[in-house]
């Protein structure tokens, strides 16, 4: 794939570099070819600065004499190499670029000095021209082809919107395949959500994929339908301002920057935000929820039930990923069957005749505090697309047993009591049955998340999630203290006695 970009100024070249930085991943190699003064260094510095969050005072020295400059504090670690002064392949080899590739993006000026390739994930940019005008010829390989094609689709979408002149800036998302960017124009900011339809994964059970069994959203339709309906009820989901449903792109209202997780990390007082979040959940539990809602364009979106098949396939992640992560082997058929049988009995107890909309990830990364609003609208809701019809206890678990940040047990108990008080005041409420469901679904969620974090590390190379495992283990053990979970506790004591030690870390 070859693309040509005509740059009329250094600023235009810098803009192209910043745009390409949105797609930066460790393991990529960007080769910068061209004569002296052709714009290679201008591009490289702008690329690095964009990965540093656009900090104008970020120090980016030239690698001309040092040969290599490393940047570990950028969003993705970068190594900037200048091979101009090297005279032999041996000197190039001694730099160890191949060893650096796994954990860095490599920006290499004068790549002609290389003998053979370093990576299949390469993008070659050839610079030519004189004066202010430059021609950048981009030749892409492997995933860079997909990125450049997607980038062109996004540019077309943004160009036709009210934010056509906005700079596209990286916005931190979650562990999913969705991407986010921030666009600002005339002092107004919006988020761009990039969510193309998910390709079918491998068949895992009963001729169905994992995402189909677990009822995970396959594309933008779920986001639009769920957000629109919740917004219409007065909840603070992000208003969708512009949409290309076919290409999986949306411009959405920005709900600010006071994310619950960030606020917690900063040591801010979370009493009001958390109580407000509890009020949202209590309000949702008191509503009658539809199984189908209108979707823009005249069609209908149907919600799935958070049934035993979905809950069970999530639980299986512990056997598939966490077990080999801890034990370095696979579970025996007997251990797996005992696990499944124990869970079958427990999940039968949380079936509910009148399910409520369950967002599933009602926790600190997806909640925003907006004190300038009133009532329930003070809590911003994002990441709603995997909403299903389930037990109201599930989202309470998500909030009070947050996998990403510590929620002290005493504070969680206080909030749990506040939730029960709100439900009791609103009408008949089975507090004992709810506590049982909370423990069962809490154990289910913790079991699932231990498997997910092990999978993220092993399959996706996202090892940072492992640091959350002790916290999740503590939640699991607390849920296992409920007398109705005695059988499940015995299974864990038999097969994972290390959990009790790991939870103390």
Which sequence ranges carry the predicted segments?
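Conserved lysine of the Walker
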Residues: 40
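ATP-binding glycine-rich phosphate-binding loop
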Residues: 161-185, 218
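Active-site acidic catalytic loop and adjacent metal/ATP-binding pocket
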Residues: 177-184, 191-192, 284, 344-396, ...
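ATP-binding pocket architecture of kinase catalytic cores
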Residues: 182-313, 317, 324, 351-352
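An alpha-helical support segment within catalytic cores of ATP-dependent transferases
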Residues: 289-304, 309-310, 314-358, 371-373, ...
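Active-site activation/catalytic loop segments of kinase-like enzymes and analogous catalytic loops
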Residues: 317-326, 392-428, 443-459, 472-480
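ATP/Mg2+ or Mg2+-diphosphate-binding catalytic cores
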Residues: 451-505
